[in-house]
Amino acid sequence: MGIPVFFKTLITDYQNVIEPVDGQKIDNLFFDLNCLLHPSCASIKDGNEDSMIQKIIADIDTLIQLTGATFVYIAIDGPAPKGKMMQQRVRRLKSVLEEKVWDTNAITPGTNFMNRLNDELHQLYDGKSNVILSDSLEPGEGEHKILQYMKQHKSVL
């Protein structure tokens, strides 16, 4: 779970913490795809899920190209522990009351949208030796999956 407005606060109030890489290559790119899912989906105003999936894939490809990463680990939030499920349910029920073209509850493990996204990402990345995808069917939050992978493979990172 992210910290609301954290990144925006960092780049606004502490501009010196971010430096351009100026052509430096990044060996390992780890990212929690949920940080990309919401803005990518929100940018598709008509709520077309096919367009959303294509936008997500295009955004992933852009990130990989911009960084020049030789290894990529993509983590998507999986089913949450029971304690967090109630918190998520309350938050999502509140968001349903807002009028939206597309219901962001679809960005939940087990929904048709997430299953389709998982399938598309597996088709793209399963044969690639330099990309690992931990999809939304694997339990755990994206950032926890990333940290677990890093701990298990620290000798090669």
Where are these regions (language model features)?
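Noncatalytic, typically N-terminal accessory segments of nucleic acid-processing enzymes
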Residues: 1-157
